[in-house]
Amino acid sequence: MLIVLLLHLFPFSPLRAESRVKKLWTKADSILTTRYYRTPYDTNYVVRPEGKLTLKLRGSQTGNSVRARGTVRDVHFKSYLSTSHKTTISIGGAYRGLAASYSINPAKLKGFYDDYELNISYYASRFCIDASYQRSSSLSGDMTFGENTLRMQREEANLKVFNITGYYVFNHRRYCVSAAYNQSYIQRRSAGSWLAGLSYQGGYIRTSDERKELRPDDPDVSIYVGHLGIGGGYGYNLVIGKKWLLNLTLLPTFVVYNRNKLTINGESQHAGRMKFNMLFNERAAVVYNFSSRYFAGLSAVANNSLFVDDAVTVHQNKWVAHAFVGMRLWK
């Protein structure tokens, strides 16, 4: 009796439930579509793709190298260390501007790669951010102390580094960064823009505990890096015909503060706090549209520091490169 009473009070119909789900989906899709086509751009220059769903397959490779030199208690030191290149494969999808992706690192799955790296990019019409964090024990290279050169192998030095660049796009109505780097927009006509930016690079390299245990007589070295830069640059999207898009961006910033330090066996040497030096942020991309549905391309982002000081000199080069193919569905 109770079941019969509940069925009378709360009638259930599979068709009615399906209708509710369909109405909710239609409403959500309408909201997403309105939001998707509400553009801050001049549509003579930048438009949204017509497909509701964009699928993309992407291969990426990243690398990082650091050169340093300095003098501590009359002992001259120099080094060149680089990480193993990280290769990932990802597949992603974006529906009306909402995106998700999944990445795998084949070398890590096989146990050959223990490093960790996170790269984040945010592209709006006015403001853009590129950020990366890397933790690596795959550093290798040479360290020289006076006349003695030591070969550093994997697991003998540790690196942690954080890079971030934020910039403002002045010609934000006609110049679109997203068109070149995530294909969420299409640049219809060539345009460029001046940029104002802020950059920071920070982190350290130090000899690992494993090396200290295996070679206790070797010098214990730590290199601390921190640069804050302010500057400006220019970016340009060149549209060739209706199929090609080429982007080149250069954003140099001037170092206004640093905390660079070299430590050998507990003795430290600091760089001048307000030394005049530079950080360079470069971008390049090529996108080819086979049709309104299919596209492919290459892109790269690099962050370089050029810091020269009589006490401590540090050059860092962090880069990431992508190759991708994609398709748009459901016009």
Q: Model regions: which residues?
A:
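Outer-membrane beta-barrel "beta-signal"
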Residues: 164-166, 317-331
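Residues that define the transmembrane beta-barrel architecture of outer-membrane proteins
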Residues: 51-53, 83-89, 94, 112-116, ...
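Outer-membrane pore/translocation modules
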Residues: 119-223
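Transmembrane beta-strands of outer-membrane beta-barrel proteins
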Residues: 53-57, 100, 118, 127-131, ...
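Outer-membrane beta-barrel pore domains and translocons
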Residues: 58-62, 94, 103-107, 134-136, ...
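Repeated loop/turn-to-beta-strand initiation elements of outer-membrane beta-barrel proteins
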Residues: 97-103, 126-131, 172-175, 244, ...
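Residue-level signature of outer-membrane beta-barrel architecture
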Residues: 93-95, 104, 122-124, 168-170, ...
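Extracellular loop and loop/strand-boundary signature of outer-membrane beta-barrel proteins
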Residues: 75-78, 103-105, 147-155, 182, ...
